[in-house]
């Protein structure tokens, strides 16, 4: 049951990200719903479930992107690992912590993408433009992350209310 809910959310997020979010592009930047969901899984899944969820989300995104295989798997897996470890030490709830942590994860994701793509391919990027775009990416992800965290929390509460047994409690 947990796997079915997880798959439905992942399919929905990738559908929205690939079809609808291009309309809301700012300076060529769109929010990365997969990264936000990896952070959410790391912060809310029990034990180390966020690591596996981040790796699966990143691998699916790598397969759908057609670019270098492994960049998203690494970055989303690291986001899941970071927040799986961090959730026991810091409460990841509220406006400011969620925004800060998603912004940090976005910068980490952008740096991983930049380092791997420039070292493995002949891609070149201007550092000034890259820094501005990464900063815009982080701010845009933070804003979208607040909305997505809210929607995912409401969905989790609704599922736990409708199915009051212990089947979905690890979510």
Question: For the regions a protein language model found, what residue spans apply to each?
Answer:
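Terminal, non-globular segments
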Residues: 1-171
């Amino acid at each position: 049951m947990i796997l079915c809910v997880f798959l439905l959310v992942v399919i929905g997020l990738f559908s929205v990200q690939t079809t609808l979010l291009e309309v809301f592009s700012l300076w060529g930047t769109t929010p990365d719903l997969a990264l936000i969901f990896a952070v959410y899984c790391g912060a809310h899944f029990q034990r180390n479930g966020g690591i596996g969820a981040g790796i699966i989300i990143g691998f699916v995104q790598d397969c759908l992107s057609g670019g270098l295989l492994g960049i998203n798997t690494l970055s989303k897996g690291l986001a899941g690992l970071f927040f799986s470890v961090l959730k026991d030490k810091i409460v990841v709830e509220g406006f400011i912590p969620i925004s800060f942590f998603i912004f940090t994860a976005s910068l980490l994701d952008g740096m991983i993408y930049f380092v791997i793509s420039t070292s493995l391919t002949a891609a070149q990027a201007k550092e000034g433009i890259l820094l501005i775009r990464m900063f815009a990416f982080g701010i845009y992800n933070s804003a979208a992350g607040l909305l997505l965290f809210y929607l995912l929390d409401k969905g989790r509460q609704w599922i736990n209310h409708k199915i009051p047994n212990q089947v979905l409690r690890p979510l």
